[in-house]
């Protein structure tokens, strides 16, 4: 099948994009990127109905590509490289010399460069200092931006969200999951989600308690130097689960009844 994505738009929510890369250009040298919303840049013009970040249009990107200093016109970058890699695989153009072509090499490209999560959220969830981390509110706003952009351009839209989390029940009932589901049910909308990529990280554990009073111990290894960590326990209704903690030196906490809104502070000698 000679399907190259012509006539559709693929939107990426990620670390940004190297818009100067030739793989994102047409044969005449113009950019295939229809727009970029850089949530980290507060110096430019925000998109309509949004109150932060800077939007750069296809005209501005083409102007930058013709300039001796493109970053003075469109100061968008991808320090991490993940967003550029993802866009290359999904929508990169043909490179005959390298024997490469993206899956949808003629699709229009739209990009949301997500801003990092706020410091208080990173601290609350124990996120490592150098870890790439985004908050759901910015992701939701990015999805809305792509949806409105596709409506404006009258294009079918594929939302590419190659982000992951170890939090939540992974049952499709979180706020973000429901929002993604609502977009996927719209005409001319498709949602692509990255999954897995955990390999042998052992971030998850599943157990089964068959009898009342049955106990199952789980060892949690916390990286040296961490000041805290977050763990979630998920059960099935109507079962009630209790837990206790054993410190590395052997102190054991009282049994904790896990109820909504409960808070406990435990001090070990």
Regions found by a protein language model. Give the residues of each.
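Exoplasmic/lumenal beta-rich domain surfaces
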Residues: 44-58, 254-269
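Short Trp-Ser/Thr-centered turn/loop motifs at beta-strand boundaries
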Residues: 215-217, 251-258
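Subtilisin-like serine protease catalytic core
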Residues: 2-135, 154-155, 188, 226-229, ...
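Substrate-binding/access-modulating region of protease and related hydrolase catalytic domains
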Residues: 118-209, 225-253, 262-264, 268
């Amino acid at each position: 099948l000679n399907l190259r994505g012509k006539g559709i738009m693929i939107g990426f929510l990620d670390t940004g994009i190297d818009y100067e890369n030739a793989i994102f250009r047409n044969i005449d040298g113009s950019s295939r990127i229809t727009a970029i919303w850089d949530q980290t840049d507060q110096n430019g013009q925000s998109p309509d109905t949004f109150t932060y970040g800077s939007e750069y249009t296809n005209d501005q990107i083409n102007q930058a590509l013709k300039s001796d200093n493109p970053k003075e016109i469109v100061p968008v970058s991808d320090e991490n490289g993940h967003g550029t890699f993802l866009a290359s695989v999904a929508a990169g153009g043909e490179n005959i010399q390298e024997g490469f072509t993206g899956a949808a090499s003629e699709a229009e490209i739209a990009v949301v460069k997500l801003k990092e999560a706020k410091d208080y959220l990173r601290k609350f969830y124990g996120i490592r200092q150098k870890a790439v981390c985004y908050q759901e509110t910015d992701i939701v706003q990015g999805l809305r931006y792509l949806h409105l952009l596709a409506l404006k351009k009258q294009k079918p839209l594929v939302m590419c969200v190659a982000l992951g989390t170890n939090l939540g029940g992974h049952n499709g009932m979180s706020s973000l999951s429901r929002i993604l589901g609502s977009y996927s049910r719209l005409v001319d909308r498709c949602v692509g989600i990255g999954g897995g990529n955990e390999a042998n990280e052992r971030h998850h554990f599943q157990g089964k308690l068959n009898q009342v009073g049955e106990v199952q111990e789980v060892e949690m290894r916390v990286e040296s130097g961490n000041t805290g960590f977050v763990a979630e326990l998920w059960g099935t209704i109507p079962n009630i689960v209790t837990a206790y903690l054993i410190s590395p030196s052997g102190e054991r906490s009282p049994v904790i009844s896990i109820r909504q809104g409960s808070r406990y502070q435990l001090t070990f000698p």
